[in-house]
């Protein structure tokens, strides 16, 4: 299904009509498994695709971060839209914080092996929350095993 519509999807991307692309091609994509065709929501796949096309505007989102922000029972794409918008607003209102963070990274990484100046702010936030979310998952696992 997606392969047949590649040109149409590319046109939507060029027009930056990202919600329309999701609604038309990824919210109920027809997936063939063996001899059956079934509808499947591909929100997670689509958000990874957006991130690949433009990592400066679209964050990568995985389930631990989605759950960390309290969206465990929400649809992936809607959660993504809210979290991505929140990241963008945080970045806009905290430019000086990112300048300070980059400065600290450069003091630690004097040879600039991390290339921190070229890492998008969205990626920095994603790394921070990925760490926090996975730490919370590990803590929850330990609490389950302790009881």
Model region roles, listed by residue range:
Residues 1-41:
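Helix-hairpin-helix/helix-loop-helix acidic hairpins
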Residues 5-9, 45, 49, 74, ...:
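Generic preference for well-ordered secondary structure
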Residues 26, 33-70:
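Catalytic DNA-binding helix-loop module of base-excision-repair DNA glycosylases/AP lyases
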Residues 63-147:
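C-terminal accessory module of base-excision DNA glycosylases/AP lyases that mediates lesion recognition
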């Amino acid at each position: 299904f997606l392969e047949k519509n590649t040109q149409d999807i590319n046109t939507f991307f060029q027009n930056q009509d990202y919600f329309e692309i999701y609604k038309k091609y990824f919210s109920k994509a027809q997936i063939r498994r063996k001899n059956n065709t079934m509808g499947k929501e591909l929100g997670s796949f689509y958000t990874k695709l957006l991130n690949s096309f433009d990592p400066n505007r679209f964050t990568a989102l995985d389930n631990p971060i989605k759950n960390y922000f309290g969206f465990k029972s929400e649809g992936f794409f809607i959660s993504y839209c809210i979290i991505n918008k929140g990241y963008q607003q945080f970045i806009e209102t905290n430019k000086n914080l990112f300048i300070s963070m980059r400065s600290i990274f450069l003091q630690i990484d004097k040879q600039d092996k991390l290339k921190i100046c070229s890492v998008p702010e969205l990626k920095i936030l994603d790394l921070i929350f990925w760490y926090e979310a996975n730490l919370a998952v590990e803590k929850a696992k330990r609490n389950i095993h302790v009881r």
